[in-house]
From Swiss-Prot:
Residues 1-29 are annotated as: Disordered. It comes from Leuconostoc mesenteroides subsp. mesenteroides (strain ATCC 8293 / DSM 20343 / BCRC 11652 / CCM 1803 / JCM 6124 / NCDO 523 / NBRC 100496 / NCIMB 8023 / NCTC 12954 / NRRL B-1118 / 37Y). GO terms for biological process: translation. The lineage of its organism: Bacteria, Bacillati, Bacillota, Bacilli, Lactobacillales. It comes from the Bacteria. One of its GO terms (cellular component) is cytosolic small ribosomal subunit. This is Small ribosomal subunit protein bS18.
Amino acid sequence: MSEQNSRPQNSERPQRSRRPQGGPRRRRKVDFIAANHIEYIDYKNTELLERFISERGKILPRRVTGTSAKNQRKVTTAIKRARIMALLPFVTED
């Protein structure tokens, strides 16, 4: 039965590297809000909120901005409030 199994054992398999050899290492993203010691994210501060919005008007995800989960929730609610108050657009046209 074991003779029919042609799959190699773990010790026989070549090791795969997760990062391509010779490629640059990615720099860890820094939480902009925590780095600048911003305690309250105000919906009226559109200059700050525009950093977290794409050119199409969508909210950028955490993996792009590098914010923590807690600060991402605060940013999201502030952006949504600013949109309702017409301080930020829901979508932008090209």
